[in-house]
Amino acid sequence: MAPIQISGHGIEITPTLREFIDKKFDRLKKHANHITSIHIFFNVTKLTQAAEATIHIPGHEISAKAESDDMYKTIDILVDKIIHQLDKHKPRNH
C-alpha cells in the first residue's frame, strides 16, 4: 500500500496518532490492493476534529470527510466511509 501523507492545521501528529492512523488505514488493503496514494488532512478547532482523505486508485480518486468531537472517532468514521467507496469501485465477478 502507498505511504500515507498526513498534514493538518491545529494538530500535532504524535507517534501514537500516527500509529493509530497506520493501523486503521491498513484495513484498506482488504478492499483495494492497488492504492497509489493516500493523503489525509486534519483541521482541528475548539469544537471539532475534522479529517479529509483523498485516495488514488487507477482510474479513480476517492475522497471522504468526517468530523466529530474526538480525533480517534473521526479517523474511524473516515476509514469506514473510504471502505464503503472502495467497495463500490471493486470489479464485479459475474
Segments the model singles out, each with a brief description of its role:
Residues 1-94:
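N-terminal, polar/charged subdomain of small-to-medium soluble alpha/beta proteins
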